[in-house]
Amino acid sequence: MRPINILILSAGTRNKIVQYFKKTLGENGKVIATDMSTIAPAIYEADKYYIVPRITEPGYIDIILDICKKENISGVLSLIDPELSLLAENEEKFKNIGTTVIGSSYELCERALDKMQMFQWLRSHGYNCAKSYVDKNELNRLQLFLYF
């Protein structure tokens, strides 16, 4: 059976998440972590770690793809929101090397980053959620109405 190797991107201070994956995988795989900082404590919990550039740097995805190939990564996930969109946008590249992107579709990642767009989608699909406002004046008018 192929080992289940997981790559956790932008691990930062999320030690418990790295520990959880290590405990769950046990001897059946490894946890590899990345971060742009050598003082990100979670990378030191992993079986192996890589220091990588910022996600906005040119060639970032190619570096991550190289790590996936080198470490025989089964699944890759990020712990920061903007990187989720980046992974989803490049999902086919990961699939082509045998790595599964663990996350939502690009469209859903982008929607989740836009509070008003997410609010409108939730409402249009029948979900109850708190009212959201884009126009500060609209909110002020509502507050005045509620106080009088």
Where are these regions (language model features)?
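Residues that form or immediately flank small-molecule/cofactor binding pockets and catalytic motifs
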Residues: M36, R54, Y106, V134-N137
